[in-house]
């Protein structure tokens, strides 16, 4: 910079612009790069970083171009930042940068020549501030000015005179007015000189912050240069007029512009955050409530402790009730009134009410008690786990009743005693008559165990959880146990509840010392603990498990499942009922009793699922025969197909074979004789 060549006109402009025009002959020695005596004016004394202190205590002035370059950089940065924020419609930040630039220009206006050179730039900056203030005017105020046919200006105006003494005696302005009286220009210059000697942050940091405007981030203003309307003593008359418009304070980091009437303006100053300060978290909560049409006031987000300490709070201090770290689980000691769902959800997993989805929030609201508090079992669980378990609730009627199940009279009677009757008459089924809390349905596959669970969901007016192994397992270590806790916690909140676990042997198989993963063992242990814990006598929760491998169940799980019902293969009468019921639904039943007896004898050892597949294959016989006659399937009608006959079932028996072996039936019968609940 020192070696560059400039013209005389440029040199004269730079000296007059930055306050060097009053030095006289001294400037020639400075421009020539020679040593000179220290600056005569305290306002033009360079910062400490530009002074080279020698051992003898003498000081050497730096190259004047460096200081000019720093001033130009600051001017361009602030001016560019204000223009950039105006383009982005960020009027609040543009206003702050414009005011900082205005103060910077005023600090360099020492002589009349300086004011003449700086005047055009100052008027341009003032116009940018006016544009920012017009952008900050709320829609309601703008409409009011349009109706009054008046240009937007100061909200508080007075056509007549005002009493200065009354203002001095005011609670808010008396102190500042009394302090400002008697202060001359000399005192202000001395104070400015003192401020110049205070070490400040390097200007490179401010330049780095302002360069972030090329992206989406916004540079934060310097805290040492922020001043409010009340304590700004050195502002010019034009600055006072600008700051008075619409009551926006300039001592805020990011002032929150909200629509407020003149009547409640005082209430906002007293109850809201002091000096208009709004933290990022509270600002986000206010925006979310405004989008959802909430009528809760922004001041309710702050706890009483934070309101009490807000007056002495700086930018580096922390207020009570706010999170102190990333995903912190800090619980504020003060309990707020009103809707407690958001406060409770903030305790779960460190998430606030704004971080939850609508489905998760709805799920938590359904589980809250009359006081708006979550039960003790669910407070330490993450909301997503609670929602995951709640999604397993069967909210649709499976349209299965006891009449749709063939045979199994003993199983129907036991389930009615354990589920249906206690729900209808809880006053009778208590004490010694209280039903068991565990039911096991075991038997060969395809015999109707899952169908019994669906019938329970249709007959019992209770919350029905349809659980499988995938519902309680996760790839994350420790999450399976939390899902088990969430399952029984939600069931306790939604009681009367029925938990149906299909293929329960996959979850509660026998625990082994070798060859078993640690996470699987912890999951079984947690499940057994919850099964033992919810059996308190007063809770209406029933656990039903269905399995094809009862011999692989853990002994502790077998003890907790007090009723163990064997679901055998359907009898001859049950098989005939299945055939008749399925064919009558489609209007295809024309078989005689002799044909039914023959079919039942030929289907010995078939399960209920095998019988259903047999009927489906038999009904395909008339269709295959019609297609063999050359009828196009696109033109085929029901009249072209004959009814189902015995021969169709005999042909289907060649395609559909029984799925259960006789050896497996022996295992089920032996286990039933040893551990099952036998029929009377």
Swiss-Prot record:
Q: Residue spans with biased composition (Polar residues)?
A: 295-308, 336-346
GO molecular function per UniProt: ATP binding; ATP hydrolysis activity
* Subcellular locations according to the entry: Nucleus
Coiled-coil segments, which residues?
Answer: none
Sequence positions that bind ATP: 406, 446-451
Q: What class of enzyme is it?
A: hydrolase
Which EC number applies?
3.6.4.-
Task: Give me the reactions it catalyses.
Answer: ATP + H2O = ADP + phosphate + H(+)
* One Pfam family in the UniProt entry: Vps4_C
What does the UniProt record say this protein does? Answer: Involved in DNA double-strand break (DBS) repair via homologous recombination (HR). Limits class II meiotic crossover (CO) formation by regulating the invasion step of meiotic HR. May counteract DMC1 and RAD51-mediated inter-homolog strand invasion to limit CO formation. Functions independently of FANCM.
Q: What is this protein called in UniProt?
A: ATPase family AAA domain-containing protein FIGL1
Which organism is the protein's source?
A: Arabidopsis thaliana
Classification lineage? Eukaryota, Viridiplantae, Streptophyta, Embryophyta, Tracheophyta
């Amino acid at each position: 910079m020192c070696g560059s060549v400039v013209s005389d006109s440029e040199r004269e402009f730079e000296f007059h612009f930055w306050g060097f025009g009053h030095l006289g002959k001294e400037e020639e020695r400075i421009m020539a790069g020679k040593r000179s005596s220290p600056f005569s004016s305290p306002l033009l004394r360079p910062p400490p970083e530009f002074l080279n202190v020698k051992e003898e205590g003498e000081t050497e002035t730096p190259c004047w171009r460096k200081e000019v370059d720093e001033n130009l950089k600051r001017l361009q940065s602030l001016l560019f930042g204000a223009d950039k924020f105006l383009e982005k419609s960020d009027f609040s930040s543009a206003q702050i940068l414009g005011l900082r630039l205005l103060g910077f220009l005023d600090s360099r206006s020492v002589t009349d020549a300086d004011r003449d050179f700086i005047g055009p730039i100052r008027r341009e900056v003032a116009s940018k501030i006016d544009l920012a203030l017009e952008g900050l005017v709320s829609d309601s105020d703008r409409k009011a000015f349009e109706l009054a046919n008046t240009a937007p200006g100061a909200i508080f105006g007075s056509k007549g005179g005002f009493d200065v003494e009354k203002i001095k005696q005011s609670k808010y302005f008396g102190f500042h007015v009394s302090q400002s009286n008697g202060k001359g220009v000399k005192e202000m210059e001395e104070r400015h000189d003192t401020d110049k000697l205070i070490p400040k942050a390097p200007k490179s940091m401010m330049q780095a912050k302002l360069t972030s405007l090329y992206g989406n981030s916004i540079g934060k203003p310097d805290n040492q240069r922020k001043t409010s309307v009340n304590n700004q003593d050195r502002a010019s008359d034009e600055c006072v007029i600008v700051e008075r418009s619409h009551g926006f304070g300039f001592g805020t980091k990011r002032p929150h512009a909200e629509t407020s009437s003149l009547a409640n303006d005082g209430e906002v100053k007293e109850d809201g955050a002091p000096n208009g300060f709004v933290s990022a978290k509270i600002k986000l909560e206010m925006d979310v409530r405004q989008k959802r049409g909430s009528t809760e006031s922004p001041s309710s987000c702050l706890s009483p402790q934070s309101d009490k300490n807000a007056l002495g709070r700086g930018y580096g201090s922390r207020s009570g009730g706010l999170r102190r770290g990333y995903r912190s689980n800090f619980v504020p000691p003060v309990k707020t009134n009103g809707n407690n769902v958001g406060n409770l959800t903030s305790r779960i997993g460190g998430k606030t009410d704004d971080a939850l989805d609508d489905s998760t929030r709805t799920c938590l609201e359904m589980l809250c008690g009359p006081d708006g508090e979550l039960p003790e079992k669910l407070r330490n669980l993450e909301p997503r786990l609670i929602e995951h378990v709640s999604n397993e609730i069967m909210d649709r009627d499976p349209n299965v009743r006891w009449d749709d199940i063939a045979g199994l009279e003993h199983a129907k009677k036991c389930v009615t005693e354990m589920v249906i009757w206690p729900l209808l008459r809880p006053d009778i089924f208590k004490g010694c008559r209280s039903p068991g809390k565990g039911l096991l349905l075991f038997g060969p596959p395809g015999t109707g165990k899952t169908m019994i669970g669906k019938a329970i969901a249709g007959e019992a007016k209770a919350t029905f959880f349809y659980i499988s192994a995938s519902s309680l397992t996760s790839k994350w270590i420790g999450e399976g146990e939390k899902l088990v806790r969430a399952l029984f916690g939600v069931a306790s909140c939604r009681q009367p509840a029925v938990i149906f676990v299909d293929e329960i042997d996959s979850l509660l198989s026998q625990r082994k010392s070798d060859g078993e993963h640690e996470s699987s063992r912890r999951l079984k242990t947690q499940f057994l603990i919850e099964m033992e814990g919810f059996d308190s006598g007063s809770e209406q929760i029933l656990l039903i498990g269905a399995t094809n491998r009862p011999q692989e169940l853990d002994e502790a799980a077998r003890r907790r499942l007090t009723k163990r019902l064997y679901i055998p293969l359907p009898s001859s009468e049950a098989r005939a009922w299945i055939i008749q019921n399925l064919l009558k639904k489609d209007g295809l039943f024309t078989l005689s009793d002799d044909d039914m007896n023959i079919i039942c004898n030929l289907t010995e050892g078939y399960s209920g699922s095998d019988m259903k597949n047999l009927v489906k294959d038999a009904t395909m016989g008339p269709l295959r025969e019609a297609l063999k006659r050359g009828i196009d399937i696109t033109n085929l009608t029901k009249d072209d197909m004959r009814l189902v006959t015995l021969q169709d079932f005999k042909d289907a028996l060649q395609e559909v074979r029984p799925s259960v072996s006789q050896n497996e039936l022996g295992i089920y019968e032996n286990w039933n004789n040893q551990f099952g609940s036998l029929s009377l």
